[in-house]
Amino acid sequence: MYKPKIICLLLGILSGLVFAPTFFIPALLTLSYLCYIVQKSENWQEATKFGYLFGFGHFLSGIYWISIGVSVYIADFWWAIPFALFGLPIVLACFISASCTLSFFAKNNKYYQFIFCLCWVLFEWVRSWIFTGLPWNLIGYAFSFSDILIQPLSIIGIYGLSFIVIYISTSAYPLFSKQFTQLKILLASSVLVLTIIVIYGAVRLSNNHTNFTDIKVRLVQPSIPQTEKWNEEEFWHNLMLHINLSENLEPTDLIIWSEAALVVPDDIPQVKSKLLKMLNSTNAILITGGISDNKKQGDEFELYSAMYALDKNNHKLFEYHKSHLVPFGEYMPLKKILPFKKLTHGLIDYKEGNGGLVYLEKYNLKIKPLICYESIFPDFVRTNNEIADVIINITNDAWYGKSSGPYQHFHISRSRAVENGLPMIRVANNGISAIVDPFGRTIKKLNLNEINGTQGLIPKKLISPTIFSQFGNFTILLLIVFILLINYLLALILDHQRV
């Protein structure tokens, strides 16, 4: 059985290419082989091994770029590179392995393929919250290359779209065992489901043009290398680069800088002077990422990754503290056991904020703030967003260089706009900055490594909230019933034709 194991590993590596930026969609068919080999396994232990090898390859090629982030400070963290490159796939492979183990026990069920899809999505959901969660590269994001194909997110969310993708991708599995009747049913139902998605997405986009508010926003992307971002000698150069990019465009209402754009407190006199000069010359409000603390001393001192707004009168209009922190990056879990420092600058761990919305009174703008990878958590973004007008996502993807990471992050983030029917303003230090409408369409964009600013009007949110934003993942139950009904009807039709 070594040959199937090697095949599973290689196909897993190939399957990781279905995500941004390659979007090699034919690789989704690798899942048909996995579905087949799990069913043909002699015991659950063998099915577990097949799933694990596939999962290891899947995450190895899909999130290899995390090791690039670790290598930024290679002198201090050289030892962590193998853990980032191989250790994370070793852990994450357990979720695909577990889904295969569970599926094996339904190998003789006539709805085996359907159960396989359910198990896959179940463990994607588990992966989104266990051990703080990492719902990166859920299989549904393979469809994010197309504005049309991601429109179902407004109804069924990313887990529902994952179910559709995995269902279509495994529809060819009876081919390996020459079960041609079942193959006809699954292929026919997959074509029908895909056709419905395409029609729904195309009609939804063609019938809904982007409507805009009167609020002008400027996105500033300085693309500062991570090695220079916290360098004291580069501080004034970096600050002036932000300011020059902010001033060198038409008049605007809001200027948005990226995550931790201000690496020092904004009340330092020389810094404050330059910020106020910029804000007075542009007559704009600055929304920026920065570092904040609770103004206490000793053991009570707490440090936060923050997003806040400043006006030309030096008033802080709101302040948001990041509530979903990156383990090992922004804090060290099990710090009493693991004698290591966090990856990001500084010796002190960041503390969690409270999340929630912020309000910009001047423009009557209710904002759902998201810092960095908070945007990858669909349930977190959906929480308390029913009165929000816009999502503002600031990030710093300079860690990952010219790799798959920044592209994947962008497409994952814009999916939240479609799910919630909200426009998204996304600003990266380096990465992909964009204005995205509530249908996920990119209105303005700055590409990876581009040093520039761009601006436009903030799109309006949808008049009515999306079905997903109201009911969340419960809509997946309707999807399951719908696809089961399609399968049942197609089976009846084929039986009637044989008679």
From Swiss-Prot:
Tell me the active site: 259, 322, 372
**Residue ranges annotated for the CN hydrolase domain, each copy included:** 220-465
Q: Which GO terms describe its cellular component?
A: plasma membrane
TM segment ranges: 6-26, 50-70, 77-97, 114-134, 148-168, 183-203, 474-494
Provide any one GO MF term from the record: N-acyltransferase activity
Task: Tell me the domain of life.
Answer: Bacteria
Report the top EC class in one word.
transferase
Q: According to the UniProt entry, what is the EC number of this protein?
A: 2.3.1.269
According to its UniProt record, in which pathway does this protein act?
A: Protein modification; lipoprotein biosynthesis (N-acyl transfer)
Gene3D superfamilies, alphabetically?
A: Carbon-nitrogen hydrolase
Which UniProt keywords are given for this protein, alphabetically ordered?
Acyltransferase, Cell inner membrane, Cell membrane, Membrane, Transferase, Transmembrane, Transmembrane helix
Q: Name one GO biological process term.
A: lipoprotein biosynthetic process
The cellular location(s) given in this protein's UniProt record come to:
Cell inner membrane
Give the way it sits in the membrane.
Multi-pass membrane protein
Family membership, please give it.
Belongs to the CN hydrolase family. Apolipoprotein N-acyltransferase subfamily.
Task: Sum up the protein's function in the record's words.
Answer: Catalyzes the phospholipid dependent N-acylation of the N-terminal cysteine of apolipoprotein, the last step in lipoprotein maturation.
The family database entries (NCBIfam families) matched by this protein are listed as: lnt
Q: What is this protein called?
A: Apolipoprotein N-acyltransferase
Q: What is the lineage of its organism?
A: Bacteria, Pseudomonadati, Pseudomonadota, Alphaproteobacteria, Rickettsiales
